[in-house]
Amino acid sequence: MRHIITGGSGFTGQILIRKLLQNGNEVVNFDIKKYTDCTLEKQSQFVYGDIRSVQDIRKLNLQPDDIVYHLAARQFADNVPRSNRQAWFFEVNVTGTQNILQAMSAAGTTRMVFFSTDMTYGMVNSCPVSEDHPQNPLGPYGSSKVEAEKLIRSYEKLNATIFRPRLITGAGRLGILGKLFRLISLNLPVPMIGNGTNRYQMVSVDDCVTAALQACKNNFPRENFNLGSLNPPTTRELLEAIIKHANSKSFLIPVPARLIKPVLSGLDKIGMTLLYPEQYAIADQNTLLDITKVNQLLGWSPSCSDITAMCAAYDNYINIKKTQ
């Protein structure tokens, strides 16, 4: 039995692979990028391939007893084009998903873990958000994940567990956080959309990996599960905690959402993107997921707080800067 990870060279993928190897499993990473952790190359099999290519996927030679963790995706951390964003996200997140599903079906491979996103919900009606909340994504990334979920559920013989995590953070995560950490490391003011009293929940990468392993342990229930931290702080509390941890002289500057959001929209349209619409639209909103279901059915509960995970991400950012 092999544990196959698509997109295993990414942030979550490498930590998942490391944990699977520690548990004595045979691991295969299917990705177009090499590992950043060189130690993983010696312990696992690497198959170079593009999820958009049916021929590349054939290199995996899928078997009925394989387990597929489908992490390959385009995200906002990548170089998102200024135009045709829907096609750009869909060719990997939707077409790529269809390709791996067809290969699994042909091989009789029936077990999958898929990481979707809470961005499938869009602007929410109430908090905390349960898994049966309507899916009304605000943009192309969330829409691509909704379509990927639909494809997965169309395969009736597939035992696929779908996770919808909040923003995944922890040591090694940058993306949008890199801009924040840079300001703090330089003791510069940190702008904040709104007054910071909203709770912007996150989830640690280690807790996400634990959830994937719990799905495996529980025979891959055909369910959708939210993933998020417990008792998230307010945005102001979170940012102040990181600034304090960094011994930075940075301070927060609240900016009225009604003023800054049109500015961010205009900057995005002319190619000077600071935040993408799907990001800034909810930055001043309460974003809390109900994790009751995953706790009850998988026995999963987060072990890492948002502040701890974000401080670990900041420390990692500083360590990387020191080596450059």
Feature annotation, model-predicted:
Residues 3-23:
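N-terminal Rossmann NAD(P)H-binding glycine-rich loop of SDR-like oxidoreductase domains
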Residues 51-92:
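NAD(P)H-binding glycine-rich loop region in Rossmannoid oxidoreductase-like domains
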Residues 95-140:
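Conserved Rossmann-fold NAD(P)-dependent oxidoreductase catalytic core, especially the SDR/UDP-sugar
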Residues 99, 173-179, 193-216, 222-223:
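Substrate-positioning beta->alpha
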Residues 136-161:
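Active-site Tyr-X1-5-Lys
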Residues 146, 169-179, 215-225, 231, ...:
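Glycine/proline-rich active-site loop of Rossmann-fold NAD(P)-dependent oxidoreductases
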Residues 243-285:
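Terminal hydrophobic/aromatic helix or amphipathic segment near a protein terminus
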Residues 293-296, 301-324:
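Amphipathic terminal alpha-helices
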